[in-house]
Amino acid sequence: MAVSLGASSRRRTAKLRRHVRVRKKVAGTPSRPRLVVTRSSRHIYAQVIDDVAGHTLASASTLDVSLRGGEGDKTEQARKVGALVAERAKAAGIAAVVFDRGGRTYSGRIAALADAARGNGLDF
């Protein structure tokens, strides 16, 4: 007897498959750390991680004091987070990163954050 999955289970399973596939290919090094983007329904978070040492080198999110208040829609907030994480990464001496979208599709808020980080000097 075959059990069919509901729509939300299929989406969750597809996200998990994408996440595993991306993480097999993407790893951060000290010279080129990983830019990880995590998204919830309300907030977006970005971290620059050196996987060898296991340390976060720079981070930004919509929960930061400088970004709190929610000016604009969620896509505009993602752009601000991308610009802020790029600024903090450059201050930490990081010019190039590898992008880890965390199993999310490259569209909407994920793409807005990535484009803003690229526009503010991060190379990926």
Swiss-Prot record:
Record bears the keyword Cell division: no
Superkingdom classification of source: Bacteria
Gene Ontology BP term (one): translation
Disulfide bridge map: none
GO function terms (MF aspect): 5S rRNA binding; structural constituent of ribosome
Gene Ontology CC terms, in alphabetical order: cytosolic large ribosomal subunit
SUPFAM superfamilies (UniProt xref): Translational machinery components (SSF53137)
Subunit structure: Part of the 50S ribosomal subunit; part of the 5S rRNA/L5/L18/L25 subcomplex. Contacts the 5S and 23S rRNAs.
Protein's job: This is one of the proteins that bind and probably mediate the attachment of the 5S RNA into the large ribosomal subunit, where it forms part of the central protuberance.
Family matches, as HAMAP family: Ribosomal_uL18_B
Sequence similarity: Belongs to the universal ribosomal protein uL18 family.
Protein name (Swiss-Prot/TrEMBL): Large ribosomal subunit protein uL18
Organism: Frankia casuarinae (strain DSM 45818 / CECT 9043 / HFP020203 / CcI3)
Lineage, highest ranks first: Bacteria, Bacillati, Actinomycetota, Actinomycetes, Frankiales
